[in-house]
């Protein structure tokens, strides 16, 4: 089998998508020696694999650090089976993922659904200090007044963490309603 088929078969045969990570640590341990090539392959091919999502969460952001930006792409559609595991892994990456989040918000302006899922899947799980680092980016998102809900989510996160004053929240909210 090609290396690609090998990784796919190993994922399918080793990981049980019905079980939590804790329930299958021994099986997941078989991936402890995963190669960088295989990680790249995971990133490029396996967004539709629930097992891959479980593996990402198990491997954790430290091991996946050079490829975090690739796994951020799994959040372009939260209905993809691996998106949940990717978002939980990336939430824990904290500071490490902020430059990549910022890049997507600034450079990929037309993919507001992706912005929406990044906010919901990662940013809202950050602590206040990390969210404060993204304050300007979030305000910029609010001001874009998109139709996909990213602006509303950005405002909700700013408000919920008291990063902008109630007056500012109110003013932005009125702007969004207009």
Locate each region found by the language model.
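Long, contiguous N-terminal structural blocks used for assembly/anchoring
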Residues: 2-30, 152-155, 177-178
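Hydrophobic secondary-structure block in the mid-to-C-terminal portion of proteins
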Residues: 145-178
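Structural detector for internal amphipathic alpha-helices that build alpha-solenoid repeat scaffolds
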Residues: 21-31, 49-62, 73, 81-93, ...
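Amphipathic alpha-helical scaffolding segments comprising HEAT/armadillo-like alpha-solenoid repeats
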Residues: 2-12, 32-43, 61-74, 95-106, ...
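Alpha-solenoid helical repeat architecture
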Residues: 15-19, 41-46, 75-79, 90, ...
């Amino acid at each position: 089998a090609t290396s690609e088929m090998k990784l796919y078969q190993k994922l399918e045969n080793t990981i049980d998508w019905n079980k939590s990570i804790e329930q299958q640590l021994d099986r997941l341990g078989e991936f402890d020696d995963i190669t960088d090539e295989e990680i790249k392959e995971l990133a490029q091919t396996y967004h539709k694999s629930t097992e891959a999502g479980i593996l990402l969460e198990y491997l954790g952001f430290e091991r996946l650090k050079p490829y975090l930006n690739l796994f951020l792409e799994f959040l372009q559609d939260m209905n993809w089976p691996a998106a949940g595991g990717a978002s939980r892994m990336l939430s824990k990456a904290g500071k490490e993922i902020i430059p990549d989040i910022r890049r997507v918000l600034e450079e990929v302006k037309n993919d507001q659904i992706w912005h929406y899922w990044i906010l919901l899947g990662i940013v809202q799980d950050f602590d206040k200090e990390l969210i404060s680092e993204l304050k300007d980016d979030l305000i910029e998102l609010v001001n874009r007044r998109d139709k996909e809900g990213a602006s509303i989510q950005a405002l909700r996160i700013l408000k919920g963490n008291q990063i902008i004053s109630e007056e500012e929240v109110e003013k932005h909210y009125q702007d969004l309603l207009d």
